[in-house]
């Protein structure tokens, strides 16, 4: 059962003295015209570098409803021309309406999984929901 699977990993993570930090990235986010918003594969290293620096306490971040994310000036844009601050801001914008729909789908899925959904996942879902419905 998926709930047991999640419980296993949450239990394992709780046993670690220094659990790894978890980052999420959507390299494939598209604009209204269906074009990819992130400039491309070669630029992924800019975000990966920020992640490593963030883990080492050397990088800044800004708070969002989803957690911490880099601002435009937090990434190393050396050697990169043509990716404007405005493009980055659009790319990293948190779409509340889309996330409300996504969280509703999560709630449906948790309902299907039943009582075996770990409380920690339900609590996290509640925190995210609160961030978008406050």
Residue ranges of predicted features:
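Conserved NTP phosphate-binding and transfer environment spanning the P-loop NTPase/kinase superfamily
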Residues: 1-134
């Amino acid at each position: 059962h998926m709930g047991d699977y999640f419980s296993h990993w949450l239990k394992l993570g709780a046993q670690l003295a220094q659990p790894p930090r978890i980052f999420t990235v959507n390299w494939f986010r598209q604009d209204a015209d269906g074009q990819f918003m992130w400039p491309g594969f070669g630029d992924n290293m800019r975000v990966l570098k920020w992640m490593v620096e963030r883990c080492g306490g050397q990088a800044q971040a800004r708070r969002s409803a989803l957690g911490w994310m880099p601002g435009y000036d937090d990434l190393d844009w050396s050697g990169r021309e043509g990716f404007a601050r405005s493009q980055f801001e659009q790319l990293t914008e948190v779409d509340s309406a889309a996330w409300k729909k996504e969280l509703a789908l999560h709630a449906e899925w948790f309902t299907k999984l039943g009582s075996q959904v770990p409380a920690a996942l339900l609590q996290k879902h509640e925190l995210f929901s609160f961030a978008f419905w406050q």
